[in-house]
Regions:
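Hydrophobic alpha-helical
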Residues: 2-63, 85
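Short, Lys/Arg-enriched charge-dense amphipathic segments
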Residues: 8-22, 44-51, 74-78, 97-104, ...
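Extracytoplasmic/cell-surface-exposed regions of Actinobacterial cell-envelope-associated
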Residues: 16-17, 70, 166
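Flexible loop/turn connectors
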Residues: 51-116
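Hinge/cleft segment of the Venus flytrap/periplasmic-binding protein
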Residues: 87-167
Length: 167
């Protein structure tokens, strides 16, 4: 199963089998596996020596980035439901033709954080009281054709939101 204990035991086994390890990618299983892997690295005294990255944001990610337990993180699947909704909404509005023998493909970006500051910005604009887009920006997105909407989706990042909100 994907538990904290499994994550810890797996990380310990990987580290033991690879004593010169300098990085670890923890993926799958939600945050529990990552919590266990971090516990193993901390218990073995390898914080800052083994750079860990993952795709599961933890509630204490800012602390883990600050103390060197985590090197970077991607995640924050905000774009998935938001842009999926906009695709359907724009199709209903007639902003672009709906194919009957194909589909539109939009690749949703993961959010990336690699410092306590970038995580604080993510928390503020993606999980806090502020949203990544202001209401006027959402109205603009709702009027875009597919290519423009796809470009807006691809541009979404923590840095993009911070820059737009700073205006």
């Amino acid at each position: 199963g994907t538990t904290t204990d499994t994550g810890r035991k797996t990380a310990e086994a990987i580290i033991q089998a690879n004593p010169d390890i300098d990085s670890l990618i923890v993926a799958g299983g939600g945050g529990d596996v990552l919590v266990g892997a971090n516990a193993a690295i901390e218990a073995l005294g390898l914080v800052g020596k083994v750079q860990t990255v993952s795709t599961d944001f933890l509630p204490d990610l800012d602390v883990k980035l600050e103390n060197g337990t985590m090197a970077a993180e991607s995640g924050g699947h905000y774009a998935d439901p938001f842009f999926a909704f906009l695709l359907v909404y724009n199709a209903i509005k007639g902003n672009y033709e709906v194919p009957t023998d194909g589909f539109y493909e939009m690749l949703f970006p993961y959010m990336f954080v690699d410092s306590p500051e970038s995580y604080a910005n993510y928390a503020q604009y993606f999980t806090g009281t502020e949203l990544p887009y202001y209401s006027d920006e959402i109205a603009e997105l709702a009027d875009m054709d597919f290519d423009a909407l796809n470009k807006a989706c691809a541009a979404l990042s923590v840095e993009d939101v911070v820059a737009r909100h700073a205006k």
